[in-house]
Curated annotation (Swiss-Prot):
Example GO BP: translation
Source organism of the structure: Flavobacterium psychrophilum (strain ATCC 49511 / DSM 21280 / CIP 103535 / JIP02/86)
Entry-linked Pfam families: Ribosomal_S18 (PF01084)
Protein name per UniProt: Small ribosomal subunit protein bS18
Complex formation: Part of the 30S ribosomal subunit. Forms a tight heterodimer with protein bS6.
Stored SUPFAM superfamilies: Ribosomal protein S18
InterPro entries documented for this protein: Ribosomal_bS18 (IPR001648), Ribosomal_bS18_sf (IPR036870)
PANTHER family from the UniProt entry: 30S RIBOSOMAL PROTEIN S18 (PTHR13479), SMALL RIBOSOMAL SUBUNIT PROTEIN BS18M (PTHR13479:SF40)
Annotated function: Binds as a heterodimer with protein bS6 to the central domain of the 16S rRNA, where it helps stabilize the platform of the 30S subunit.
Domain of life: Bacteria
Keywords linked to the UniProt accession: Ribonucleoprotein, Ribosomal protein, RNA-binding, rRNA-binding
Family statement: Belongs to the bacterial ribosomal protein bS18 family.
The keyword Ribonucleoprotein is assigned to this record: yes
One Gene Ontology cellular component annotation held by this UniProt entry: cytosolic small ribosomal subunit
Length: 98
């Protein structure tokens, strides 16, 4: 087979197939809001160790799809993190926070 026929058939060694379906595992466990589970009503901005669970290594607030928090508590977490940053309990940016 010539290289032209191999490229047309798509059976060349080491060839990447772009139209093949990816094996995406959609059976992941559902994430639940830890605040609803524990019954936490108030998120304390002075507890920086607890708030570090909701920021990444650079100090950015993690999105809901990664943390699993509900919309109501995600807003409260973001307000608490912003207050903690303003009062210097947490840094605004960091190279490696954790």
């Amino acid at each position: 087979m010539s290289t032209l026929q191999q490229s047309a058939s798509g059976k060349k060694d080491g060839d990447i197939r772009y139209l093949t379906p990816l094996n995406i595992d959609t059976n992941k466990t559902k994430k639940y809001c830890r605040f609803k589970k524990s019954g936490i009503k108030y998120i304390d901005y002075k507890d920086a160790d607890f708030l570090l669970k909701f920021v990444n290594e650079q100090g950015k607030i993690l999105p809901r799809r990664l943390t699993g928090t509900s919309l109501k508590y995600q807003r409260k977490v973001s307000v608490a993190v912003k207050r903690a940053r303003h009062l210097a309990f947490m840094p605004y940016v960091a190279d490696l926070l954790k």
